[in-house]
Amino acid sequence: IGSGSGAAGACIVRDRLAPDCRIVGVQSSAAPAAYLSWRAGQIETAPCLTRHSGLATGRGFELPQSVIVAGLADFIIVDDAEISDAARVFAHLAHTLSEGAGAAALAGLLKATSHPDRVAVICTGGNASADEIADLARG
C-alpha cells in the first residue's frame, strides 16, 4: 500500500461482489504511514525511507483510509529486501516484470505464516525503473 487507493478500491469491489473475501494490505517497513494510520484509526505520519517509489508515502491519505480502516482483514509489513526478492520471484518464475510496489503483495504472501485455501495476489505496478530492471537481470 502506498496511498491506499488500490486497496480501498479492492475493498469496495469485494463488498459488492464477494463479501466473504479477506483483503490483506502490505506495506514497506521503510514507509509505514498507511499501516500506522490503519492501526490507529486516524491519519498518521512516519518517515518515508523506502527505495520503492510506488510505496513512498509519509502520511496516510484520508479518503483511502476511510475505506481500508474497516475493509482490510489484516496488514503485513515487509522490508525493502523482501519486496525486491518478491520482484525477482515474479520476474524469474512468473515471467512478470514488476516494480517494487507491484511486488509488495507477493512479499506479504511469502512472509505470511498461514494461508487460506485460495489466495490471489494482485501485481499492481509494472513501472520498473532501469535500476530495478538491472537488479532483476542480475538475479
Model regions and ranges:
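Phosphate- and divalent-cation-binding pockets in alpha/beta enzyme and binding domains
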Residues: 9, 33, 85-86, 107-108, ...
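Short beta-strand segments
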Residues: 1-2, 25-27, 121-124
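Short, acidic Gly/Pro/Ser/Thr-rich loop/turn segments
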Residues: 8, 31-33, 62, 127-130
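FAD-binding core of FAD-dependent oxidoreductases
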Residues: 6-7, 55
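A glycine-rich, Thr/Ser-enriched phosphate-binding loop motif common to dinucleotide/cofactor-binding enzymes
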Residues: 99-103
